[in-house]
C-alpha cells in the first residue's frame, strides 16, 4: 500500500522517492526525498511517523533542504551509533547546472524527527549517491552507487565501498584512496 494517504505537498513540483524506514523509540520513522530530477534546488528530505511499518505515515514536514549545505538533498540514510542518531544524504554534482554534490550527514534529535547538530562538510563524493552506512568492529563502511545510470546497456552504474575509523571519514577503498 501507499505510505501516505496524501502525498506531502510542502514542496511543490516534486516527486516522492528514496524512502528509508527505521524503528526508532517504538515508532516507525520514514525519511524520504521530495525532489525534481532537473531542479536540484527543489530537492528536500522529509520525515514522517507511523505505528506500523506499512503506514499510513503522518508527515512531520521538511527536515533538510538545499539551504542545509547541499543542493542534492536526496537519498536519505539513517544510522545510529553509540546512542547518537545520524542522517546521511547526497548525490552527484553537476557543474554544468551549477551545484556541488557529495555526501553529508547531520546528528538528529533523540526521536529522529529534527536536526540536533550542524551539517557536516562533504565526507564522500562528488560522484556517489544512494548510500548506506554500516559499522563492523572498529570500522564504518559507506556503500554507494556511482557511474552513469539509466542508459540501458551503456550504464556503468555500480556499487562502491569505502571504510573509515571515524564516522566523519575519510572513507577510503582498499588502495587507500
What is each residue range found by the language model?
Residues 1-177:
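Carbohydrate-active catalytic/glycan-binding domains of CAZyme proteins
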Amino acid at each position: 500500500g501507499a505510505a501516505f494517504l496524501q502525498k506531502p505537498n510542502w514542496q511543490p513540483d516534486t516527486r516522492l522517492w528514496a524512502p528509508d524506514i527505521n524503528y526508532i523509540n517504538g515508532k516507525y520513522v520514514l525519511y524520504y526525498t521530495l525532489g525534481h530530477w532537473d531542479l536540484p534546488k527543489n530537492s528536500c528530505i522529509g520525515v514522517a511517523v507511523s505505528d506500523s511499518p506499512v503506514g499510513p505515515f503522518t508527515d512531520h514536514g521538511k527536515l533538510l533542504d538545499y539551504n542545509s549545505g547541499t543542493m542534492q538533498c536526496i537519498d536519505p540514510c539513517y544510522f545510529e551509533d553509540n546512542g547518537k542518531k545520524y542522517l546521511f544524504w547526497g548525490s552527484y554534482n553537476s557543474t554544468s547546472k551549477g551545484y556541488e554534490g557529495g555526501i553529508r550527514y547531520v546528528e538528529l534529535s533523540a526521536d529522529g524527527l529534527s536536526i540536533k547538530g550542524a551539517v557536516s562538510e562533504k565526507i564522500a563524493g562528488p560522484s556517489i549517491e544512494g548510500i548506506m552506512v554500516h559499522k563492523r568492529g572498529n570500522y564504518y563502511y559507506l556503500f554507494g552507487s556511482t557511474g552513469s545510470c539509466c542508459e540501458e546497456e551503456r550504464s556503468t552504474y555500480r556499487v562502491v565501498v569505502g571504510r573509515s575509523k571515524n564516522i566523519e571519514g575519510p572513507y577510503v577503498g582498499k588502495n587507500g584512496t
